[in-house]
Amino acid sequence: MEDLTGITGNSYVVVDLQKIKRNVEKIRAHIGENVKFLPVLKGATCGHGLEEIAEFLVSECQFDMLCVGHTIEAERIRNFGVNCDILVLGGTPFNNIPYVVENKITTTLSNADYARALSAEAVKRGTTAKVHIKINSGLGRMGAKPGDELAALLNDINGLPGIDIEGAYTHFSNSAKIDTAIIEQEAATFDSGLAQIKAAGITLKYCHAANTPATVRFPQYHYNMVRSLLLLVGYDWSVDQFNRLGLEKVLYWRGFVAQINEVKAGERFDYGLALTASRDMKVAVTSFGYSDGYPDDLPGNGGFVMVKGQKAPILSLNMDQGFVDITDIPDVCVNDQMLLIGQDGDEEVELTELLANSKHSGTYFFSLINHRVRRIFKR
């Protein structure tokens, strides 16, 4: 547990940056020196934090390029004093174009209208704007399909002033599954798109397709760059071999016991008196609620926290507080800490166990942890 003297907040997340550094070393060893690792920091690195992690990756792990989901994430990183290359993976609304051009943000290009607007802004400012062409290999989201669609795009953008086509990429739809037929087809589709780009006379510095599962499982699809968020923070749920890189989970989340109530058998409590005590109970009121980002489908559905090294079922969760059953845990006191997720000392709440009955993924869980939860970064 951390020394919280002088720190405000009803719950807190600890992120161990040295564990991130060790994870980076293991990822780089896995992909080899001829492949570049591009850390993905979208969604505030899935709730782990944004600016501090970006700064650490550049200053301590020697990264010269990061990627994010939206322009505003790139802006936050720039405002923190981080001046490396930043690639925005998501679509860029046209009102963001002046910012990305002025601040040297690389964006995703998948349609000619965006390319023309970006070109006009770059020419107006007397500069160039870097882009990565997105190829739709099957996911059906952003990107141009190889064939006539990509040919038309290349015809429209080739030679546009102020545009530097630095790279091309795709995003696999199914790289986590045992069956490899889909990823093989999507890689072949991506290859055909790269061939079209080359035939159009465009030389690419970077080609990338591998997300987290593909980075671990399919070295043949690494090209010269791979992207991952989850590997960075210690999660690899590869179906054929769990955590084969030996990564370390970098985050844990703790809250507090705000009050302890004695509840008699048959007594009702919670909003709408929705809960009824099945026996004489001790119920701890939590210092956190769903507005802190804890998923609302876990209470009463296998969700639990660790209190004094023992599992305590979550009975219900309100906006700012909730109810936890501590009847069978002795000597619990007000202000004792609860572990919500991660490992701290001998206590651990393992994500796959916690989410066993949930409809949500691990990335969803972490992305929900909001700004109200204090982040503590250990360097």
Pin down the residues of each PLM region:
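Short secondary-structure boundary/capping segments within folded domains
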Residues: 28-31, 275-277
